[in-house]
From Swiss-Prot:
Belongs to the type A lantibiotic family. The modification 2,3-didehydrobutyrine is found at residues 31, 52. The modification D-lactate is found at residue 25. There is a cross-link at residues 44-47, 46-49 (Beta-methyllanthionine (Thr-Cys)). Disulfide bonds: none annotated. There is a cross-link at residues 36-40 (Lanthionine (Ser-Cys)). Keywords: Antibiotic, Antimicrobial, Bacteriocin, D-amino acid, Lantibiotic, Thioether bond. The gene is elkA. This is Lantibiotic epilancin. Residues 1-24 form a propeptide. It comes from Staphylococcus epidermidis. GO terms for biological process: defense response to bacterium; killing of cells of another organism.
Amino acid sequence: MNNSLFDLNLNKGVETQKSDLSPQSASVLKTSIKVSKKYCKGVTLTCGCNITGGK
């Protein structure tokens, strides 16, 4: 009985981590996109961002 309760709690913890991870990784992705765009504007000649419309 104790083992099944422990398994249940463990699974709950895993599910919570999964749901927490999604919005967090999405915001990290957005941030890195912003940073790369800003960086691209500074080095248009090197990375060729002028093709995508960066100035």
